[in-house]
């Protein structure tokens, strides 16, 4: 049995894809894979922040098209890159184990969010990270920083930036625990990560029962439950890439905590909820953030 797998061609994308395929191999040892590498708009356009490009699903659209056209059976993505609603005819069927979902301050010196020097140049092209950072540390300078993980790390090491706000998951997957820069995790109560950060997913056509069955058996249950809550939050919060909103679910002992936040104009608002039903918790968190945004 051979499964054709569409993925982006970056080093990190290929590592993430292999991680998920290893989970599939564990439940279906005889399955074989053929990689279909796709170059996306987000990979090609590197000269401006993502929110200025004006394309929805900038890292996922072309990869999913490979499945819709029959060029691949499965599309693999970082869950955080998927919009709240998938292209009709597609479903998320597989979930990797979750890497650390937090954002980090990456620097040569080992700065934390609160030990960054006044006037430090901090790189990020994420609206969410930039708005929360300005709210927490209005005395640092936020500058756009695009490129793959290696490129961004290189700009820190070369001294072009004093630090950058990055996803811990990508750094750990790429470098293990020996990254060339020092990492200081940021608590979600300070800068809530984007929904889905740290989870890699498999997207397939609806109705592909045999493939959906394999991927569901290979999925990590905790990641799937947390993703359900965070996707529900994303669907109901009503915020696009121009709005600084984050949300993180943590599932333990049959219950779920959810930290969500919104930042704008130098102010930030963070809430924390608990519950048992993932969808209900995600919806409640979205409703609270919507109320805050409407009153801001």
UniProtKB/Swiss-Prot annotation:
Its cofactor is dipyrromethane. It holds the Pfam family Porphobil_deamC. PANTHER family: PORPHOBILINOGEN DEAMINASE. This is Probable porphobilinogen deaminase. It is an enzyme of class 2 (transferase). The modification S-(dipyrrolylmethanemethyl)cysteine is found at residue 241. Tetrapolymerization of the monopyrrole PBG into the hydroxymethylbilane pre-uroporphyrinogen in several discrete steps. Keywords: Porphyrin biosynthesis, Transferase. One of its GO terms (cellular component) is cytoplasm. One of its GO terms (molecular function) is hydroxymethylbilane synthase activity. It catalyses: 4 porphobilinogen + H2O = hydroxymethylbilane + 4 NH4(+). The porphobilinogen subunits are added to the dipyrromethane group. SUPFAM superfamilies: Periplasmic binding protein-like II (SSF53850), Porphobilinogen deaminase (hydroxymethylbilane synthase), C-terminal domain (SSF54782). The lineage of its organism: Archaea, Thermoproteota, Thermoprotei, Thermoproteales, Thermoproteaceae. Its EC number is 2.5.1.61. Pathway: Porphyrin-containing compound metabolism; protoporphyrin-IX biosynthesis; coproporphyrinogen-III from 5-aminolevulinate: step 2/4. Belongs to the HMBS family. Binds 1 dipyrromethane group covalently. One of its GO terms (biological process) is protoporphyrinogen IX biosynthetic process.
